[in-house]
Amino acid sequence: MGVEEHKKEAPKTFKFGVITVSDKGAKGEREDKSGPLIIEELSKLGEHVYYKIVPDDKIEVLIALFEAIKSGADVVVTTGGTGITRRDITIESIKPLFDKELSFGEVFRAKSYEEVGYATVLTRATAGIIRGQERIVVVFSLPGSVNAVKTGLEIIKSEVFHILKHARE
């Protein structure tokens, strides 16, 4: 069966949560523009069930992820904390939970290269599947910049239903 046939058999909607990882955002010192953009765009495809801004702290990121999952999210998108500074801990927090890692990061970096050139080596955007006993959740981790989020959303919106179909098999 080809990609188009798989997409026809894919779910038609999903529930999603958004987590913004930002020290300044969590303190109210910086407006979160990326989280609301994700909510706006994914609301065209699914139901928004969770949103939270957390500091760059592993425990806070994990608590928010588990809250999003408990809220019924089939898909969780994080934004922020994917760079290479000491405070960028989103990937280290979430990636160990993945049962399967997707090639999202490679595609994201290829698309980003078209926009920012070699600076794309600074991103560690990733995605993966977390399998529970009764539920499966797809997690995408995007950089915090609005332009990077737009790039990530282009990929997510194109493949999220296809990913959900296969993840649930």
From Swiss-Prot:
One of its GO terms (biological process) is Mo-molybdopterin cofactor biosynthetic process. Its EC number is 2.7.7.75. Keywords: ATP-binding, Molybdenum cofactor biosynthesis, Nucleotide-binding, Transferase. It catalyses: molybdopterin + ATP + H(+) = adenylyl-molybdopterin + diphosphate. It is an enzyme of class 2 (transferase). The keyword Lipoprotein does not apply. Gene3D superfamilies: MoaB/Mog-like domain (3.40.980.10). Optimum temperature is >80 degrees Celsius. GO terms for molecular function: ATP binding; molybdopterin adenylyltransferase activity. Pfam families: MoCF_biosynth. SUPFAM superfamilies: Molybdenum cofactor biosynthesis proteins (SSF53218). InterPro entries: MoaB (IPR012245), MoaB/Mog-like_dom_sf (IPR036425), MoaB/Mog_dom (IPR001453), MoCF_biosynth_CS (IPR008284). One of its GO terms (cellular component) is cytosol. The keyword Nucleus does not apply. Belongs to the MoaB/Mog family. PANTHER family: MOLYBDENUM COFACTOR BIOSYNTHESIS PROTEIN B. Catalyzes the adenylation of molybdopterin as part of the biosynthesis of the molybdenum-cofactor. Homohexamer. This is Molybdopterin adenylyltransferase. It comes from Pyrococcus furiosus (strain ATCC 43587 / DSM 3638 / JCM 8422 / Vc1). The gene is moaB.
